[in-house]
């Protein structure tokens, strides 16, 4: 059963833990599984696939390439991107806050 907080965030009980960029999530299955626990109840909230070294290497490579584009992006466009991120956080603040 999926925990209500995960449902509110559009997540399932089992999730890939690593976003690789370019709309791609890691499919690594041999790096282990993380099981976050509610410290109050001891309940496992969900399962998150751990990341491999190859995942991390790819993320760093893509992040470095993305930074080269980001640093040449005009400030107003960067500001708009940050505003959209903040808007998404505000939209989900109650569910995100319950994870803390």
What are these regions (language model features)?
Residues 45-100:
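Glycine-rich loop-to-alpha-helix module at the N-terminal edge of alpha/beta enzyme cores
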Residues 1-47, 80, 84:
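Terminal low-complexity tails and localization/encapsulation signals of metabolic enzymes
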């Amino acid at each position: 059963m999926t925990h209500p907080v995960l449902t509110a965030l559009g997540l399932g009980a089992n999730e890939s833990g690593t976003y690789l960029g370019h709309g791609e999530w890691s499919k690594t299955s041999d790096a282990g599984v993380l099981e976050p626990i509610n410290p109050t109840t001891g309940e496992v909230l969900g399962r998150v696939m751990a990341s491999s070294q190859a995942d991390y290497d790819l993320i760093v490579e893509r992040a470095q390439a993305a930074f080269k584009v980001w640093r040449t992006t005009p400030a107003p466009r960067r500001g708009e991107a940050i505003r959209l991120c903040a808007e998404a956080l505000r939209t989900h603040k109650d569910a995100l806050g319950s994870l803390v």
